[in-house]
């Protein structure tokens, strides 16, 4: 019996073929035309310079005969009704997309390429979730029948864009990659949507975004005649998307290389490019350079927009510098144009404060390099960052000139105020958050009035402070003010109830959200309430909500699976956690990460099933994942639970090798297997291992672990180890009836025990005195 009930579907698979989208933004700015772009083959014909590039048009015409279409598809035995195709095409040309879909569903034959491509295009172009699902179902059918070649590049590109804008990043990327593998280049707007969606996603999304951008631009460069691929060449928007990925990673070198590459494609940086640069400065901790990005925009004559102001305030709030953020908002309220001057003054004040702090700490500046955390490598890295910003912002090298003025006055809007309010919320300033809301209500400018994001921020502030009644009052006030609460607002409230272990009230809110507000819960809503069930040890409830989510057609995310695994692991049901893990592995929409592996290891280790846990770790390594501190911590606890100190020695050996990775220099090593990353153990891991070794009388290994703790700045719990030694080993090596052979064998162990007693401060042979509990003999 499968504990994870699949959602109701005609498919026999445990998972729906594609996730149901939550929402779609307004129609994308992509011209819907009947004649699609040409598909350019990018397969190996480029090796022969004299050979013409193969091109074929996937566009059909309304007058195409059945024989022509059959010949084009390469399947002369296939028959379909030309009359039905004409009716379908008539509906599509008149923008009767829903009627065309009904006609397609009722038809028993597969329409021709023109009808299919146009139907997918128009469904993708609509801003309705069900339309995207319909378009995806057509693609699924064609894939199953091996007829994907019936769709043209325009329809696939629109489908990828719609999927990206609805949050289905992996689906959008898979469509783009499928086009590339088939030898076709997607339209720049289509692949830019995928790159942008990846750059903003979590995990390794930004890295994959950069890889996708490079892969496409390399293929475009292969064409000698660039006019053939003019619609696939990257534009400024494409570069902004990949630069955003670099900013999210804090990778200044890649940012600079791609920024320089813009000129090769005749692309000029725009205001969004520099807004992304503000984010880059924030990610790498270069707060003092933000003002020079703004000055660079003004000096280059680029039109400053309100999004730049948003980026500035968000950057300073992210640094926790609410003082500067408040000054920006105040300058905007006073209709000042000398914002650059204000920011330079803030930089000068920060520099002065930093110099004063350094003067106070001057006596600590000459401590040992290791103690202070200083390394030459860190200095080189910092210097590299400085050099990149000197190229990106040459105006920052000599900022002695007069700061430029803004081209016009910008008044703060609700987003500016809300961003500042989020800073108050993160700092626990609940009263300031509430006062800001009241001040926004009194603004004359309607653009400054609070919106649903503002109210949600206030709700978050009260929830974080544990004031759930006040948070519900804000929700009621939103209804009175005519500001509809959104899904995020309800999710914040759900999280608050779950944190306070009020799962019943969370369930009531979930029903209220659906029935009264008409807002369907999403995967985040269910993840929150599943996690709440874990907090009250209700694994059955967690499973029930997981199955309810799938029944509603909501695709589980990585967090959904790992949260359910946590429920079973915490309740002592590792086999059920393993079954959830297997479902996760088989779900193509989810990428298994180290957290999921660790949760599986934790489930077995909690019961002392160390052999099962070790098998999971072996599988993990085979799949390219290296154990981290959490993995080793679970294993150490499992060894302690199973009372197998011998396994602790093997575990310590592996950890010791991982800790020494950075110290080993092997620049010319030609090994095919990459070395595992360096491990920095924490107090919990080392303390558990030391505890096991002391109890098992492995004093030499215990001293090694203690030395490792001291190297990593972790104070050993000497009192605890002394108590263990006195209780368990105080009479060790005191037998007078041991044979000489036995005495000889334990010489090394006795020496280690004496060294350990010396470290504990107990009487030992190093003092030349006997350890006796009785009165001292003079």
From Swiss-Prot:
Domain of life the protein comes from: Eukaryota
Compartments, as annotated in UniProt: Plastid, Chloroplast stroma
One cellular component term from this protein's GO annotations in UniProt: chloroplast stroma
Record keywords, A-Z: Chloroplast, Nucleotide-binding, Plastid, Repeat, RNA-binding, Transit peptide
Main subcellular location: plastid
Spans of repeat PPR: 235-269, 270-304, 305-339, 413-443, 451-485, 486-521, 522-556, 557-587, 593-627, 628-658
Bias-annotated ranges (Acidic residues): 355-372
Stretch list, region Disordered: 351-381
GO BP term (any one): mRNA processing
Transit peptide feature, positions: 1-65
Regions that span the bilayer: none
Intrachain S-S bonds: none
InterPro entries: Pentatricopeptide_rpt, TPR-like_helical_dom_sf
GO MF: mRNA binding; nucleotide binding
Function: Involved in the processing of polycistronic chloroplast psbB-psbT-psbH-petB-petD transcript. Could bind RNA.
Family: Belongs to the PPR family. P subfamily.
Name the record gives this protein: Pentatricopeptide repeat-containing protein At3g09650, chloroplastic
Organism: Arabidopsis thaliana
Gene: HCF152
């Amino acid at each position: 019996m499968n504990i994870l009930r699949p959602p109701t579907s005609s498919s026999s698979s445990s998972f729906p073929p594609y996730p149901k989208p939550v929402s779609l933004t307004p129609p994308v700015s992509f011209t819907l035309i009947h004649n699609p772009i040409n598909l350019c083959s990018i397969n190996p014909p480029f090796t022969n310079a004299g050979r013409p590039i193969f091109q074929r048009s996937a566009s059909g015409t309304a007058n195409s005969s059945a024989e022509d279409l059959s010949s084009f598809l390469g399947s002369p035995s296939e028959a379909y009704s030309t009359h039905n195709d004409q009716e379908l095409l008539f509906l599509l040309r008149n923008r009767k997309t829903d009627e065309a879909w009904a006609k397609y569903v009722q038809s028993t034959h597969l329409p021709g390429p023109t009808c299919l491509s146009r139907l997918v295009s128009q469904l993708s172009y609509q801003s309705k979730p069900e339309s995207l699902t319909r378009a995806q179902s057509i693609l699924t059918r064609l894939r199953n029948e091996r007829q994907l070649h019936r769709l043209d590049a325009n329809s696939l590109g629109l489908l990828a864009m719609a999927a990206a804008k609805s949050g289905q990043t992996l689906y959008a990327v898979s469509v783009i990659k499928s086009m590339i593998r088939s030898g076709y280049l997607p339209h720049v707007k289509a692949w830019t949507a995928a790159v942008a969606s990846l750059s903003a996603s979590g995990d390794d999304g930004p890295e994959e975004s950069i890889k996708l951008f490079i892969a496409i631009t390399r293929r475009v460069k292969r064409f000698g005649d660039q006019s053939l691929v003019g619609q696939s060449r990257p534009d400024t928007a494409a570069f902004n998307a990949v630069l955003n990925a670099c900013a999210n990673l804090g990778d200044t070198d890649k940012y600079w290389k791609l920024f320089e590459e813009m000129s090769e494609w005749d692309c000029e940086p725009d205001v969004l490019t520099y807004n992304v640069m503000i984010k880059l400065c924030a990610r790498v901790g270069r707060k003092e350079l933000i003002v020079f990005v703004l000055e660079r925009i003004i000096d280059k004559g680029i039109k400053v927009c309100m999004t730049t102001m948003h980026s500035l305030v968000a950057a300073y709030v992210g640094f926790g510098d609410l003082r500067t953020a408040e000054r920006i908002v105040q300058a905007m309220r006073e209709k000042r144009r000398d914002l650059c001057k204000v920011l330079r003054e803030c930089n000068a004040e920060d520099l002065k404060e930093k110099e004063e702090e350094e003067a106070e700490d001057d006596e600590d500046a000459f401590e040992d390099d290791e103690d202070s955390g200083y390394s030459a490598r860190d200095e080189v890295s910092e210097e590299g960052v400085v050099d990149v910003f000197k190229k990106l912002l040459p105006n920052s090298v000599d900022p002695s000139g007069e700061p430029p003025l803004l081209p016009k006055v910008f008044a703060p809007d609700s987003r500016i105020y809300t961003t500042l309010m989020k800073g108050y919320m993160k700092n626990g300033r609940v009263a300031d958050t509430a006062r800001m809301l009241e001040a926004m209500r009194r603004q004359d400018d309607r653009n400054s009035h609070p919106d649903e994001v503002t109210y949600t921020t206030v709700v978050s502030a009260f929830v974080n402070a544990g004031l759930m009644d006040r948070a519900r009052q804000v929700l009621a006030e939103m209804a009175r003010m005519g500001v509809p609460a959104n899904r995020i607002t309800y999710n914040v409230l759900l999280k608050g109830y779950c944190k306070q272990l009020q799962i019943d009230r969370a369930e009531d809110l979930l029903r209220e959200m659906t029935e009264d507000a008409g807002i369907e819960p999403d995967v985040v809503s269910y993840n929150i309430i599943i996690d709440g069930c874990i907090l009250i040890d209700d694994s059955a409830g967690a499973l029930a909500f997981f199955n309810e989510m799938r029944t509603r057609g909501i695709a589980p995310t990585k967090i959904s699976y790992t949260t359910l695994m946590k429920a079973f692991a915490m309740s002592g049901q590792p086999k059920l956690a393993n079954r959830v893990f297997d479902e996760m592995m088989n779900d193509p929409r989810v990428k298994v990460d180290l957290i999921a592996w660790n949760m599986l290891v934790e489930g077995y280790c909690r019961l002392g099933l160390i052999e099962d846990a070790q098998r999971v770790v072996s599988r993990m390594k085979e799949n390219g994942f290296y154990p981290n501190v959490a993995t080793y911590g679970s294993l150490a606890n499992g060894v302690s639970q199973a009372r197998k100190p011998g396994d602790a020695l093997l575990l310590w050996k592996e950890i010791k090798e991982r800790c020494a990775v950075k110290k080993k220099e092997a620049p010319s090593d030609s090994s095919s297997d990459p070395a595992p990353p360096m491990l920095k153990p924490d107090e919990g891991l080392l303390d558990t291992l030391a505890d096991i070794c002391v109890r098992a009388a492995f004093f030499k290994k215990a001293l090694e672990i203690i030395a490792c703790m001291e190297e990593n700045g972790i104070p050993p719990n000497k009192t605890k180890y002394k108590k263990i030694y006195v209780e368990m080993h105080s009479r060790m090596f005191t037998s007078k009836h041991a044979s000489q052979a036995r005495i000889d064998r334990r010489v090394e162990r006795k020496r280690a025990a004496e060294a350990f007693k010396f470290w504990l401060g107990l009487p030992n042979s190093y003092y030349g005195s006997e350890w006796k509990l009785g009165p001292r003999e003079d």
